[in-house]
């Protein structure tokens, strides 16, 4: 903010606030009338012209007012670093709703998205925990043909991953049962990443060479869990709220948006970058900062949630660059905290 005077910054933030509220280009008379700037419309107009020249505002038509650029929105968002917290009543309502969702919903991630979309008035995105951080509940082997087993990995969240693995020697039913029992004890309470590490350590232990059954169990387990990367589910709810935006009245722009939401590569990349920020951090990607997602017309506000004491997945709001950041940022922050709390209780 060092390149702006206090007066210029005050006028710029008033322009951003008005644009967020109305979605319309902002004129000097509106700012003079509504924001108590103690300046004439002519003085404000001169400052707006300077802000436009500095890259903070854009005038779509010479006769129209001005709209904030991504640079102005970023400046405004950074000034909101002290998030406005939800009221105790709002926080209690949020926690109670998530307790209901995780206690009874068949698809809690989707229900979370629907609820957040409703609260924010924008689209909501929820990413399931990354594979290596997801707890494994069961590991089973099913003989399919000589020299081959089907490994079935059942995660604690109910998702399943299957893969075929080759075996050098036939395994009878009794031996397979003992292997299942042994691996059940080993994987209990551990994530996929922890289980992979455990198998590697056990197989490197020379003392295991004399225990043929245990060694075979860990060899099968290692094969079954190696490179298993069930794609983390990314739920998007409230897409219609994006489609209905005037920013996407243009058909070609709308087609690009729908393609981006369907393929989700840009979105997944942004969510991964949010994970890297760590717990308790709300990350905002404004317009062009979100890459090709939304053609520069959208912003993503996202935060990680925790599971098993680790950063696991992300939750966020996807909306127009003129979204109400002062409302959405604390809402996303509180949602991530509520998800962390509830997921720690519901297994």
Curated annotation (Swiss-Prot):
InterPro entries: GAF-like_dom_sf, HrcA, HrcA_C, WH-like_DNA-bd_sf, WH_DNA-bd_sf, WHTH_transcript_rep_HrcA_IDD. Pfam families: HrcA. The keyword Iron-sulfur does not apply. Keywords: Repressor, Stress response, Transcription, Transcription regulation. One of its GO terms (molecular function) is DNA binding. One of its GO terms (biological process) is negative regulation of DNA-templated transcription. Negative regulator of class I heat shock genes (grpE-dnaK-dnaJ and groELS operons). Prevents heat-shock induction of these operons. NCBIfam families: hrcA. Belongs to the HrcA family. This is Heat-inducible transcription repressor HrcA. The gene is hrcA.
């Amino acid at each position: 903010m060092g390149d702006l005077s206090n007066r210029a910054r005050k006028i710029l933030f008033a322009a951003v606030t008005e644009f967020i509220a109305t979605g319309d280009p902002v004129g000097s008379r509106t700012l003079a009338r509504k924001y108590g700037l103690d300046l004439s419309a002519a003085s404000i107009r001169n400052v707006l012209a300077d802000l436009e020249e500095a890259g903070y505002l854009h005038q779509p038509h010479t006769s129209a007012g001005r709209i904030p650029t991504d640079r102005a929105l970023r400046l405004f968002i950074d000034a909101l670093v002290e998030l406005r917290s939800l009221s105790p009543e709002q926080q209690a309502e949020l926690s109670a709703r998530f307790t209901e969702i995780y206690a009874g919903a068949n698809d809690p991630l989707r229900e979370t998205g629907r609820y957040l979309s409703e609260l924010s008035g924008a689209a909501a995105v929820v990413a399931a925990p990354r594979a290596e951080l997801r707890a494994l509940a069961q590991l089973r082997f099913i003989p399919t043909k000589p020299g081959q087993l089907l490994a079935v990995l059942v995660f604690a969240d109910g998702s399943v991953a299957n893969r075929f693995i080759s075996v050098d020697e036939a395994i009878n039913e009794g031996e397979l049962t003992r292997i299942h029992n042994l691996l059940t004890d080993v994987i209990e309470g551990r994530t996929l990443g922890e289980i992979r590490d455990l198998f590697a350590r056990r197989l490197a232990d020379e003392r295991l060479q004399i225990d043929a059954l245990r060694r075979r169990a860990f060899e099968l387990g290692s094969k079954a869990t190696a490179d298993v990367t069930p794609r983390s589910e990314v739920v998007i709810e409230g897409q219609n709220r994006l489609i209905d935006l005037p920013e996407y009245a243009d058909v070609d722009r709308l087609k690009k948006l729908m393609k981006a939401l369907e393929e989700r590569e840009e979105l997944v990349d942004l969510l991964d970058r949010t994970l890297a920020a760590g717990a308790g951090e709300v990350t905002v990607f404004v317009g062009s900062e979100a890459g090709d997602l939304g053609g520069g017309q959208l912003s993503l506000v996202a935060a990680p949630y925790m599971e098993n004491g680790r950063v696991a997945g992300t939750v966020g709001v996807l909306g127009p660059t003129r979204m109400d950041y002062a409302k959405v940022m604390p809402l996303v922050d509180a949602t991530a905290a509520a998800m962390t709390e509830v997921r720690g209780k519901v297994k």
